[in-house]
From Swiss-Prot:
Encoding gene (name): rpsD
Protein name (record): Small ribosomal subunit protein uS4
Annotated spans, Disordered: 1-49
Keyword Ribonucleoprotein annotated: yes
Bias-annotated ranges (Basic residues): 1-12
Keywords from the named record: Ribonucleoprotein, Ribosomal protein, RNA-binding, rRNA-binding
GO CC entries: small ribosomal subunit
Highest classification ranks of the organism: Bacteria, Pseudomonadati, Pseudomonadota, Alphaproteobacteria, Hyphomicrobiales
Ribosomal protein listed as a keyword: yes
Family according to the record: Belongs to the universal ribosomal protein uS4 family.
Amino acid sequence: MSKRIQAKHKLDRRMGQNIWGRPKSPVNRREYGPGQHGQRRKGKMSDFGTQLRAKQKLKGYYGNITEKQFRRYYAEAIRLRGDSGENLVGLLERRLDAVVYRAKFVATPFAARQFVNHGHVKVNGVRVNIPSYQVKAGDLIEVKESSRQLEIVIVATQLSERDVPDYIEADHAKMTARVTRIPSLSEVPYPVQMEPNLVIEFYSR
């Protein structure tokens, strides 16, 4: 098991929130952070601390993206026209592993990254094994025919915990999906509040 997967429960406890909306999240049982000092009362957080927390939460949600890669998303978000926070969310939601997760082909962002890495996904008929691949609106995403009967796929498509968002058209009979448009922050079904503008402020310091 990778360190990223081992750390997901720790992130929930550190944030005191169920980041992925999972029934087995440790914060469903306790609301304090990890470690022996997790129950201490916390004082008011500084602006820097608030921005850092927003960054850790958003970065962690997408499978704990590396800092180097997340900085690249920030750089691209401020380069694009429009609201930089909205741009950041759009770039993250266009990741191939994010689309695979949103389409309910697998149950978690961590599983989505591994699923793509192992070559189970095609984009416009071509196998792509890069989780960060940027999907464009209209691209056809499909699970390889030989991978459609994998247990993780069958279980994920039957999950009732979350729905496929409106900006993705998913056909679980054919195991295909399309991103119909780049979503705004308000459209993304985050289980907790995400504050991408605070992330932009963090990197803009």
